[in-house]
C-alpha cells in the first residue's frame, strides 16, 4: 500500500467530521497554510487554489491537492482570487465539502458566500445575510443602533459623490475619514484634515477599494484623534450561542493597517473592558452571528468606546488570542460550520480564561526608511526565529522565494507569548533579532525601534502613534554584512577583479605571515597583549605642539619617519595597499618603530584612492590604525588650500576637514602648496593651527639648485623659508618630490637653513628615483636635519623613499636615530611578502632612473604616469613621454611639480605625445587646440600663482577669452560651503552620516557618492583578506573574514553555475558558516541585451523613479507638461495599495517613459524634468 493511501486511511479512521472532510481554502499565502494545519489535525483532506503568478507559492505545496485558477493571462494576479465562479467550479469538480475564505479577497463577499451554499458546499463563516448586515460598515452602524451600542458620527449610508462627503465635512468639521464599506487591511481609507483635497482623497479611496475588494462603495465618519483600537474575538454556533475570547489591542497601525497587536490590552481599565466585551456579544446576538468574527471598537481619551464594525472573518491577529486562551479558533470555525455547538466544543464563557500576554509582529518586505515602500525581489537568505514562546505563521518565507509586487507584503507573523507583557516584549525583540532575511528590505529594524520606544513599553500607544512619532524612524538597520560580501566574492568569481590598475593576479597565493619581535634577551614580544613603549606621541599629548617641536629639535641625533603606510606604496604600488594589511602589521609596527618621529599614513592620494579604487572609508582606516598604534605620531599630507583635493576649495571646507583629521587621529600635518604659493599655503597652515595640530609648513624642492642659472636656487629657497617662518610653523618641511636633491645640494641647503634658524626643527623628504637618496638623506642628517624620511627595505628604493636599513647603516656610529635595527629587519619580512601580494600593481621599473635630473617627474607620479601611458597605448613611447614631460614643464614656465601641478605637466605631456606635437607646435597652435582641463585650470589660475608668473603669450592663447585670468588666491573667489545644508542633504540621501562624511563629500563629491553606492551593494570590503579582494577564490578554499571582534565568517566557494542565456546571469554557490548560499551575478563578458527599463539616478533630482514595483494606473503628465513641486505625475498600484508619485520640484516634463497599465520595477525611470527648469539648489 502506498504511503498516500496509508495516510488517507488514517484520516478516515480518525476523522472528527465523518464523511464530509474535504476543505478548500479560497485564499493565498500565510492564511491557507494556517487553515490547512488545523484541518489536518481534524484529519481533513485539503485543497489549495492558486493564480498563475502564485504557482511557486508555498501554500499550494502545503495542501493535499492544488489547482490553478483559470489559464495564464485569464485573470490578473489579484483577480484570480476574486473569480468566484471559477473557484466554485474547482470545488465542485473535486468534491469539496467546505470552503474557508481566509481573510481579504472574497472573505467578506456575501455573494460568494451565497454561491458557495447554493453549490451545496458548506461555507465556513457567517451566512450571506449576516455578512450583508455587518460586513458593510454602514449596515453595521444600523446594527449598533438596534443593539443600543455607541458609534462614531458618520454618514447614514454609503455615499456616491464628492459633494456628499463635503456636506458631511461642513456639518461635522475636520478631521474625517473616508472608508471603504467593504474589506479591510487599511485599503480604501483616507484621512482628510483641514486644507486637504477632499475630492482627491475620495477618488483614491474608492479606486483602491474597487481594486482590492471589487466594490468601491465608501462612507464618511468623524475621525477620532489618538484613540485606541480594541477588537473582541467572537465565536458563535448555529444555535444562537455566542462567546467572546477576550480582546486584542490593535492600536499600533500604519495607514490603518495593523503592525503590532497585543492580547489582552495592557492599559484598558477593567470596567471599560467589561463594557466592550458585553457590547460585542450583544451585537453578535442581535444580528444572529455565526462562526468566528471580530467586533471592533475605538476607545477615546476619556475611555469612551465606540463600535466601528464587525469583521465577519478570521483575522490576521487571531494567533495571539489562541496563545492566551489555548483555543484553536480555526478548528472551532470548521467544527461549528460542520454543526458542532459551543457546548460540544467545550467553549463556555465562564470556562474561557486568559493566561499571560501575547504580542504579534507582522514582518513585511517593506522599507520603513522610504515610507514603508514595498520591496520586491528574491529572498537570498531566510532564517527564522524560534525557541520558547515563539510562534511563526508564514507563507512564502523561504530562501529562493520571489516576492512579487502583486500581493500583500507580509512574509511571516511572529507571535510571542509569556506570563507578563514585559517578558513578551523582550522575547519579541530577541526573536526579531534572530531573523536573517536577505535579498529584500524588511520592517524588522522599525519593529525593533517600536518595541523599545517608551510609549510601547508602557502600552499607551494609539492608532496614529506611528505617524505621530518620527523618532520611530531613527532605526538601526540590519547590516547584512555577510550577504553583501558574498555578492562581491560572487562577482569576482564570475567577472574577475574590477580594481583599476590591476594587471593579473597576486604572486603571493597565501596571506602574509606576521613576524615576531624579540626583546634584548631573545624573548618573543607579545605585541597584542603588551602595550607598546611610549613614543613621541606621548610627548605631543602631554606637552602640546610647541614643546613637542622643541624636544624634537633637542634630540641628540636624527629621527626617522617611515613612509611605508603612505608615500612608499603610492610610489611603488599605485597607492593600493589596503587597511586590512596595514592593520595586520600595526601592533608589530607600534613596538618595532616606537622611537620613530612619525608614521606617514594618511592624506594625499591615499584619501581618494581608498574610496575610489579600494572601496574603503579613509576615516575608518585612520581611526582603526590610530587605535592600534597609540604611541607613534601620525603624519598626513595636506595640499594647502586644496585639502586633499586637486583644486582649491573654500576656506571653511579646509578648516572643517583639518578639524576632522585632527579629531580622528592625525597629529602632524605636512602642509604644502604645489607652486610654493604662500597665500595658498597659509590657508592650510591656519587650519591646522585652529585644530591644534602640529604644523609642518613645507617648501617644495624642484630641480638641481646647484646648476648655474636655475630658477629655483638657494636664494629662492631661503626667501620662501623666511616667509614660512614669519607665517609661523612648528616644523619646517623640505619636500623633494622627484628625488633631484643631490648630496651636495642637501648639505648646502640644510646647512644654510640650520645656520639661519638654529631652533627650528627641519624635516626632509625625498625619493630614491635616481638611486642617490640614501646619500642625500645622510648628507641632510650630517648637515643638521632633525628628521628624514625612509621606507621599510622591501618598500624602498626606485620611486619610493630610501631604505631605512641603508640609512641606519650610513649613520651608524655617528648619529643616533632611536630605532632598533633588529626590529626593523623583522618588520621587513612582512613587507617582503606584502610586495608580492600587490605585485599586480607594480610598475615595470627595473632600477634607478638618473634621467630624473632632466625630466624631474615626481616619484609618486612616475609609476602612475607609466601606467597611464600604457592605458593610452603610449607604453612603447615611454622615453618620448619623459622627454615630453620635460618640454611640457618648460612650456608651463618651469613650475614646481607636485600634485596637482605635476598632473598638469603630465596631462600636457601625454597630450603632446598622443597628438605628435612639439613644444614649438604648442606655442604656434595654442589658440586653436583643445587642451586638457587641468592645463586650462592651471592657466586660469585655479591652482595658484607660479613663481615668476605665467608664460605669455601662451597663457592668453590657451585661454582664448574662454576663461578669466585669476591674479589672486582662487579660494577668495569661492563661496563658503553651506556645511549644514550639505550635512542635511547627505543625511537624506545616505542615512546615518557624520562630520567625516561631510568632509569627504566636500573633497570629492562624485567619488564619495560612488563609494556609498559600492558600500550599499557590497558592505565594508576592508575586512576581506587582500588575496580574496583581488583574486577569485579557489573552489573549496576556506576564507576567514572577521567582521567584528568575536565574529568570524567562514566562507567557501562551492561552484560557479552555467550561464543563463536569457538573463546573462550565473549562479554562484557558497558555503557560509556551513550553510548553503546562492548568489546570482550578471556575466559581464556576455553581450546579452537587457529588456529592463532604464533606472532613475537617485542622486539626480530631475529624474523621477518608481518608488516601488507595481502597475501604472494613471499617467498624469505628458512631454512638455509644467508641474509644481508635490504635484502628482502618476498613480502606481502595488501590493493592493495605491501610491501617488509626485514631482520633487517645479519644472517642465522632458520625457515620459511609462504608459497606463504598464508594469514597473522599483527605481524604474518614469519621468525626466528639464534640468534647466530646476532651482539652482536642486541642479546636479
From Swiss-Prot:
Active-site annotation: 313
Record-level Gene Ontology MF annotations: ATP binding; metal ion binding; pyruvate carboxylase activity
UniProt KW Transit peptide keyword: no
SUPFAM superfamilies: Aldolase, Glutathione synthetase ATP-binding domain-like, post-HMGL domain-like, PreATP-grasp domain, Rudiment single hybrid motif, Single hybrid motif
Induction: By glucose.
Top-rank EC class of the record's enzyme: ligase
Domain ATP-grasp positions: 141-338
Protein name listed in UniProt: Pyruvate carboxylase 2
Pfam families in the cross-refs: Biotin_carb_C, Biotin_carb_N, Biotin_lipoyl, CPSase_L_D2, HMGL-like, PYC_OADA
E.C. designation(s): 6.4.1.1
Sites of N6-biotinyllysine modification: 1136
GO biological process entries: gluconeogenesis; pyruvate metabolic process
Cofactor (UniProt): biotin; Zn(2+)
Function text: Pyruvate carboxylase catalyzes a 2-step reaction, involving the ATP-dependent carboxylation of the covalently attached biotin in the first step and the transfer of the carboxyl group to pyruvate in the second.
InterPro entries given in the database record: Aldolase_TIM, ATP-grasp, BC-like_N, Biotin_BS, Biotin_carboxylation_dom, Biotin_COase_C, Biotin_lipoyl, Carboxylase_cons_dom
Subcellular location(s) of the protein: Cytoplasm
Signal peptide positions on this chain: none
Pathway involvement of the protein, from the record: Carbohydrate biosynthesis; gluconeogenesis
Protein source organism: Saccharomyces cerevisiae (strain ATCC 204508 / S288c)
Binding locations of ATP: 137, 221, 256
PROSITE patterns on file: ATP_GRASP (PS50975), BC (PS50979), BIOTIN (PS00188), BIOTINYL_LIPOYL (PS50968), CPSASE_1 (PS00866), CPSASE_2 (PS00867), PYR_CT (PS50991)
Amino acid at each position: 500500500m502506498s504511503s498516500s493511501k496509508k495516510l488517507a486511511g488514517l484520516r478516515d479512521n480518525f476523522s472528527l467530521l465523518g464523511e464530509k472532510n474535504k476543505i478548500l481554502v479560497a485564499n493565498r499565502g500565510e492564511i491557507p497554510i494556517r487553515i490547512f494545519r488545523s484541518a489536518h489535525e481534524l484529519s481533513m483532506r485539503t485543497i489549495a487554489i492558486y493564480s498563475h503568478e502564485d504557482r511557486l507559492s508555498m501554500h499550494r505545496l502545503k495542501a493535499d491537492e492544488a489547482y490553478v485558477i483559470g489559464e495564464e493571462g485569464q485573470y490578473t494576479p489579484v483577480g484570480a482570487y476574486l473569480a468566484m465562479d471559477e473557484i466554485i467550479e474547482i470545488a465542485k469538480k473535486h468534491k469539496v465539502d467546505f470552503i474557508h475564505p481566509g481573510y481579504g479577497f472574497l472573505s467578506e463577499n456575501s455573494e460568494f458566500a451565497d454561491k458557495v451554499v447554493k453549490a451545496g458546499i458548506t461555507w465556513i463563516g457567517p451566512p450571506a445575510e449576516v455578512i450583508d448586515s455587518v460586513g458593510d460598515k454602514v449596515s453595521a452602524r444600523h446594527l449598533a443602533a438596534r443593539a443600543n451600542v455607541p458609534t462614531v458620527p458618520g454618514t447614514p449610508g454609503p455615499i456616491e459623490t464628492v459633494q456628499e462627503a463635503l456636506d458631511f465635512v461642513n456639518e461635522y468639521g475636520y478631521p474625517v475619514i473616508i472608508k471603504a464599506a467593504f474589506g479591510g487591511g487599511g485599503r480604501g481609507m483616507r484621512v482628510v484634515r483641514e486644507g486637504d483635497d477632499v475630492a482627491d482623497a475620495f477618488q483614491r479611496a474608492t479606486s483602491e477599494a474597487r481594486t482590492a475588494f471589487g466594490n468601491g462603495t465608501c462612507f464618511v465618519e468623524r475621525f477620532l484623534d489618538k484613540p485606541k483600537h480594541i477588537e473582541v474575538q467572537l465565536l458563535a454556533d448555529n444555535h444562537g450561542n455566542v462567546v467572546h475570547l477576550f480582546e486584542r489591542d490593535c492600536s499600533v497601525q500604519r495607514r490603518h493597517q495593523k503592525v503590532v497587536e497585543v492580547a489582552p490590552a495592557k492599559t484598558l481599565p477593567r470596567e471599560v473592558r467589561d463594557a466592550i466585551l458585553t457590547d460585542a456579544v450583544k451585537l453578535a446576538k442581535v444580528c444572529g452571528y455565526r462562526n468566528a468574527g471580530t467586533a471592533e471598537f475605538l476607545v477615546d481619551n476619556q475611555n469612551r468606546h465606540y463600535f466601528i464594525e464587525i469583521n465577519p472573518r478570521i483575522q490576521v491577529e487571531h494567533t495571539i488570542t489562541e496563545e492566551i486562551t489555548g483555543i484553536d479558533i480555526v478548528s472551532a470555525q470548521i467544527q461549528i460550520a460542520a454543526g458542532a455547538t459551543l457546548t460540544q466544543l467545550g467553549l463556555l464563557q465562564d470556562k474561557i480564561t486568559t493566561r499571560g500576554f501575547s504580542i504579534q509582529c507582522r514582518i513585511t518586505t517593506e522599507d520603513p526608511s522610504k515610507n514603508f515602500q514595498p520591496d520586491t525581489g528574491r529572498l537570498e537568505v531566510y532564517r527564522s526565529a524560534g525557541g520558547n514562546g515563539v510562534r511563526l505563521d508564514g507563507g512564502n518565507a523561504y530562501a529562493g522565494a520571489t516576492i512579487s509586487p502583486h500581493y500583500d507584503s507580509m512574509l511571516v507573523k511572529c507571535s510571542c507569548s509569556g506570563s507578563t507583557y514585559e517578558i513578551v516584549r523582550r522575547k519579541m525583540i530577541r526573536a526579531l533579532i534572530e531573523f536573517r532575511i536577505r535579498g529584500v528590505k524588511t520592517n524588522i529594524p522599525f519593529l525593533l525601534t517600536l518595541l523599545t520606544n517608551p510609549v510601547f513599553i508602557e502600552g499607551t500607544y494609539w492608532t496614529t502613534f506611528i505617524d505621530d512619532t518620527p523618532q520611530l524612524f531613527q532605526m538601526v538597520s540590519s547590516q547584512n554584512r555577510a550577504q553583501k560580501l558574498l555578492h562581491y566574492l560572487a562577482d569576482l568569481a564570475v567577472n574577475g577583479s574590477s580594481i583599476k590598475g590591476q594587471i593579473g593576479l597576486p604572486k603571493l597565493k597565501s596571506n602574509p605571515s606576521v613576524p615576531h619581535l624579540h626583546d634584548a634577551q631573545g624573548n618573543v614580544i607579545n605585541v597584542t597583549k603588551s602595550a607598546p613603549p611610549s613614543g613621541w606621541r606621548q610627548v605631543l599629548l602631554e606637552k602640546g605642539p610647541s614643546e613637542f617641536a622643541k624636544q624634537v629639535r633637542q634630540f641628540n641625533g636624527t629621527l626617522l619617519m617611515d613612509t611605508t603606510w603612505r608615500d612608499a606604496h603610492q610610489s611603488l604600488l599605485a597607492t593600493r595597499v589596503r587597511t586590512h594589511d596595514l592593520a595586520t602589521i600595526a601592533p608589530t609596527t607600534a613596538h618595532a618603530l616606537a622611537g620613530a618621529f612619525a608614521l606617514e599614513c594618511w592624506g594625499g592620494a591615499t584619501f581618494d584612492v581608498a574610496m575610489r579604487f579600494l572601496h574603503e572609508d579613509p576615516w575608518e582606516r585612520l581611526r582603526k590604525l590610530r587605535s592600534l598604534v597609540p604611541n607613534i605620531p601620525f603624519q598626513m599630507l595636506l595640499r594647502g588650500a586644496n585639502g586633499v583635493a586637486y583644486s582649491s576649495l573654500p576656506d571653511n571646507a579646509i578648516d572643517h576637514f583639518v578639524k576632522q583629521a585632527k579629531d580622528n587621529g592625525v597629529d602632524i600635518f605636512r602642509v604644502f602648496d604645489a607652486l610654493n604659493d604662500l597665500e595658498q599655503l597659509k590657508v592650510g597652515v591656519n587650519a591646522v593651527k585652529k585644530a591644534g595640530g602640529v604644523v609642518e609648513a613645507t617648501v617644495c624642492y624642484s630641480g638641481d639648485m646647484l646648476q648655474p642659472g636655475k630658477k629655483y636656487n638657494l636664494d629662492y629657497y631661503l626667501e620662501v623659508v623666511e616667509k614660512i617662518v614669519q607665517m609661523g610653523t612648528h616644523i619646517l618641511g623640505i619636500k623633494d618630490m622627484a628625488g633631484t636633491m643631490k648630496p651636495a645640494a642637501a648639505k648646502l641647503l640644510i646647512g644654510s637653513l640650520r645656520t639661519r634658524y638654529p631652533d627650528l626643527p627641519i624635516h626632509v623628504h625625498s625619493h630614491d628615483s635616481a638611486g642617490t637618496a640614501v646619500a642625500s638623506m645622510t648628507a641632510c642628517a650630517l648637515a643638521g636635519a632633525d628628521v628624514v624620511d625612509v621606507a621599510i627595505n622591501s618598500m624602498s628604493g626606485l620611486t619610493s623613499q630610501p631604505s631605512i636599513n641603508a640609512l641606519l647603516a650610513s649613520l651608524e656610529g655617528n648619529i643616533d636615530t632611536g630605532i632598533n635595527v633588529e626590529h626593523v629587519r623583522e618588520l621587513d619580512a612582512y613587507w617582503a611578502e606584502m610586495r608580492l601580494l600587490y605585485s599586480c600593481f607594480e610598475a615595470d621599473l627595473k632600477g634607478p632612473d638618473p634621467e630624473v635630473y632632466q625630466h624631474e617627474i615626481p616619484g609618486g607620479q612616475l609609476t602612475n604616469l607609466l601606467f597611464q601611458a600604457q592605458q593610452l597605448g603610449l607604453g612603447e613611447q615611454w622615453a618620448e613621454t619623459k622627454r615630453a614631460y620635460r618640454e611640457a614643464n618648460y612650456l608651463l614656465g618651469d613650475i614646481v611639480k607636485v600634485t596637482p601641478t605635476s598632473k598638469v605637466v603630465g596631462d600636457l605631456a601625454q597630450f603632446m605625445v598622443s597628438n605628435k606635437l612639439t613644444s614649438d607646435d604648442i606655442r604656434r597652435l595654442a589658440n586653436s587646440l583643445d587642451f586638457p582641463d587641468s592645463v586650462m585650470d592651471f592657466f586660469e589660475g585655479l591652482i595658484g600663482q607660479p613663481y615668476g608668473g605665467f608664460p605669455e603669450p601662451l597663457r592668453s592663447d590657451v585661454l582664448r577669452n574662454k576663461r578669466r585670468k585669476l591674479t589672486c588666491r582662487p579660494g577668495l573667489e569661492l563661496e563658503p560651503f553651506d556645511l549644514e545644508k550639505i550635512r542635511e542633504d547627505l543625511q537624506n540621501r545616505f542615512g546615518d552620516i557624520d562630520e567625516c562624511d561631510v568632509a569627504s563629500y566636500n573633497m570629492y563629491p562624485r567619488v564619495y557618492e560612488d563609494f556609498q553606492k559600492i558600500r550599499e551593494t557590497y558592505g565594508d570590503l576592508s575586512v576581506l583578506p587582500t588575496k580574496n579582494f583581488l583574486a577569485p577564490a579557489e573552489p573549496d578554499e576556506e576564507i576567514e573574514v572577521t567582521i567584528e571582534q568575536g565574529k568570524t565568517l567562514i566562507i567557501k566557494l562551492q561552484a560557479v553555475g552555467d550561464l543563463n542565456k536569457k538573463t546573462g546571469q550565473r549562479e554562484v554557490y557558497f558555503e557560509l558558516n556551513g550553510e548553503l548560499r546562492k548568489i546570482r551575478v550578471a556575466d559581464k563578458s556576455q553581450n546579452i541585451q537587457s529588456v529592463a527599463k532604464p533606472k532613475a539616478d537617485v542622486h539626480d533630482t530631475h529624474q523621477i523613479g518608481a518608488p516601488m514595483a507595481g502597475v501604472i494606473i494613471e499617467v498624469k503628465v505628458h512631454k512638455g507638461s509644467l508641474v509644481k513641486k508635490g504635484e502628482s505625475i502618476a498613480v502606481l498600484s502595488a501590493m493592493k495599495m495605491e501610491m501617488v508619485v509626485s514631482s520633487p520640484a517645479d519644472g517642465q516634463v522632458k520625457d515620459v517613459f511609462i504608459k497606463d497599465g504598464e508594469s514597473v520595477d522599483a527605481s524604474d525611470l518614469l519621468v525626466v524634468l528639464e534640468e534647466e527648469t530646476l532651482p539652482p539648489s536642486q541642479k546636479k
